UniProtKB/Swiss-Prot annotation:
It comes from the Bacteria. Transmembrane segments: none annotated. It comes from Synechococcus sp. (strain JA-3-3Ab) (Cyanobacteria bacterium Yellowstone A-Prime). One of its GO terms (molecular function) is nucleic acid binding. This is UPF0102 protein CYA_0680. Belongs to the UPF0102 family. NCBIfam families: PRK12497.1-3, YraN family protein. Pfam families: UPF0102. InterPro entries: Restrct_endonuc-II-like (IPR011335), tRNA_endonuc-like_dom_sf (IPR011856), UPF0102_YraN-like (IPR003509).
Length: 133
């Protein structure tokens, strides 16, 4: 089997999950500043601002029964370090935001396939999922 179609399918699933979380955050009053922001250390799925808080959101979209507990285990210490470095790079390019309180959130989205098609649901939204140590 050619891995490219599967990779494209997984990327599309991730994009749909990010779009779902983006909509959720906007409904909660957050202003989205960036989506899929890239730097040498990785990618920030979503960056949002509300009042005096800036959040960096890692979105994990999985099928039910995934090996990594719905994506939660995929945000281990190495991934957290990459996200922190990427956030520092983002702030260095946007110094006017550096005085805001920063938080790292993780959104877990479940992708369910059925005879009627595919649906997505927010399983958990972890505010302050990890901290800068």
């Amino acid at each position: 089997m050619d891995p490219l179609p599967r990779r494209a399918s997984l990327q599309n699933t991730g994009n749909v999950g990010e779009g779902w979380v983006r909509q959720y955050l906007c409904q909660q009053g957050w202003q989205i500043l960036a989506q899929r922001w890239r730097c040498p250390w990785g990618e920030l799925d979503l960056v949002a601002h509300k009042a005096d808080v800036l959040i960096f959101v890692e979105v994990k979209t999985r099928s039910p029964g995934s090996w990594d507990r719905g994506g939660l285990l995929a945000v281990g210490i190495p991934k957290q370090r990459r996200l922190i470095r990427a956030a520092q790079a983002f702030l260095s390019q946007h110094p006017h935001l550096s005085e805001l309180s920063c938080r790292f959130d993780v959104a877990l989205i479940e992708r369910r396939a059925s005879g009627e098609g595919v649906s997505y649901a927010l399983v958990d939204y972890l505010q302050a999922a990890f901290e800068i140590c």
